[in-house]
């Protein structure tokens, strides 16, 4: 689960981290009143969406007068903001964050995330802040891996401070900040805490100017405050609906629908489709409790995406019996108008029975595939016809 910048900064404050004063607003009048309340002569007017790259997309403006606050708020509120992370469809801006201006001397990048390969916490830092970290040269980035059983230590912070060429005073301030961020990361079940930029002010303080946080959905049951920060408007409606049926669905931008059981097989199926020149339209794991009704619902959700030109069903029957999937496919054809080709590869428990069920149904656009690669190739070929 992701949250907005204004919510992330609320959490930063909860953990004793100094951030600039700001107020979330939903109207132009509120934006103007917020700027007056904050005081000063410079304000940042920031679109609040769950995506990075807002500045480049025109979603962050620096106002040097109340008239400019009003002007920028009018332009940004209600706009469809397109960034590298939103995709071409963009996101509608419904909220703004009005933040008091900061005297910036230098910008850095700092983040904490989970390193799955090394099974540790990775602290990533760079002296090139304020831009996408993916675009920064590798030799300008330092990654410090922290053993969770040991935790953050002075030498971790010193290594980062040395890499960033900070003086003694700032090195101490960085360690204090990192210690608080590390505690925030652990105690909120985060999977990402990204500060970009972390700014050095002209007053010689280190201040998070922007903050992005993501959380482990499976831990939200013990994070009531964070769970209440969920903004349904920022999430894909089909993904939310899928969850209510026990389906794990993520919309992508390809044209080949995927229905698979098991996250690992789903990833392998998507890789195979990519490998034979196709592009998946979604990730969909029907899970271990799939029945004909949930399979039919999965078809319905996949087919809402008008970009889908074929569907590849790849099931290895274990907990999920293949005959259940076959009956679900037939149920879907009754409940939903399935006009695109459906390529079906079934293996494992009751695979023979499933093949017979589909054969007896004699539906022309349901095509059996003998193996994964053949099914992927057929899906790509039929999608491109």
UniProtKB/Swiss-Prot annotation:
Residues annotated as domain ATP-grasp: 9-241
Q: Which domain of life is it from?
A: Bacteria
- Where ATP binds, per the record, is at 46, 53-55, 99, 102, 107
Q: Kindly list the positions annotated as binding substrate.
A: 261, 318-320
Q: Give me any GO biological process, just one.
A: tricarboxylic acid cycle
Q: How is the co-factor bound, per the entry? A: Binds 1 Mg(2+) ion per subunit.
Which family does the entry's similarity section mention? Belongs to the succinate/malate CoA ligase beta subunit family.
Give the protein name, as stated in the record.
Succinate--CoA ligase [ADP-forming] subunit beta
Organism lineage reads as: Bacteria, Pseudomonadati, Campylobacterota, Epsilonproteobacteria, Campylobacterales
Which gene does this sequence derive from?
sucC
């Amino acid at each position: 689960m992701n949250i907005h910048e204004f919510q992330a900064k609320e959490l930063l404050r909860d953990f004793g981290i100094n951030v600039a004063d700001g107020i979330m607003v939903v109207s132009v009048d509120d934006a103007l009143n917020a700027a007056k309340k904050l005081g000063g002569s410079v304000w940042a007017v920031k679109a609040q969406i769950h995506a990075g790259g807002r500045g480049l997309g025109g979603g962050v403006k620096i106002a040097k007068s109340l008239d400019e606050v009003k002007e920028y708020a009018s332009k940004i509120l209600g706009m469809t903001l397109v960034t590298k992370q939103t995709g071409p469809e963009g996101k509608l801006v419904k909220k703004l964050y009005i933040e008091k201006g900061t005297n910036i001397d230098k910008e850095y990048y700092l983040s904490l995330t989970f390193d799955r390969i090394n099974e540790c916490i990775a602290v990533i830092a760079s002296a090139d802040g304020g831009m996408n970290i993916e675009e920064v040269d590798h030799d300008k980035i330092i990654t410090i891996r922290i053993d969770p059983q040991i935790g953050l230590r002075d030498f971790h912070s010193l290594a980062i401070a040395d890499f960033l060429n900070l003086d003694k005073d700032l090195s101490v301030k960085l360690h204090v900040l990192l210690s608080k961020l590390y505690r925030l990361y652990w105690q909120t079940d985060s999977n990402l805490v990204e500060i970009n930029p972390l700014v050095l002010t002209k007053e010689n303080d280190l201040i998070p100017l922007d903050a992005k946080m993501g959380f482990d959905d499976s831990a939200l049951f013990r994070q009531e405050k964070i769970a209440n920060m969920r903004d349904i408007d920022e999430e894909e409606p089909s993904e939310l609906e899928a969850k209510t049926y026990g389906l794990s669905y993520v919309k992508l931008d390809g044209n080949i629908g995927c229905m698979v059981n098991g996250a690992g097989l789903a990833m392998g199926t998507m890789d195979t489709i990519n490998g034979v020149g196709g592009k998946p339209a979604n990730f969909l794991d029907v899970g271990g409790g799939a029945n004909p009704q949930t399979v039919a619902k999965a078809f319905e959700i996949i087919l809402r995406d008008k970009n889908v030109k074929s569907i590849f069903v790849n099931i290895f029957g274990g907990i999920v019996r293949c005959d259940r999937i076959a009956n679900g496919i037939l149920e879907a054809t009754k409940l939903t108008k399935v006009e695109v080709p459906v390529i079906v590869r079934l293996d494992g428990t009751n695979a023979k029975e499933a093949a017979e069920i589909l054969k007896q149904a004699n539906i022309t656009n349901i095509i059996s595939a003998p193996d994964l690669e053949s099914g992927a190739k057929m899906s790509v070929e039929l999608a491109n016809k």
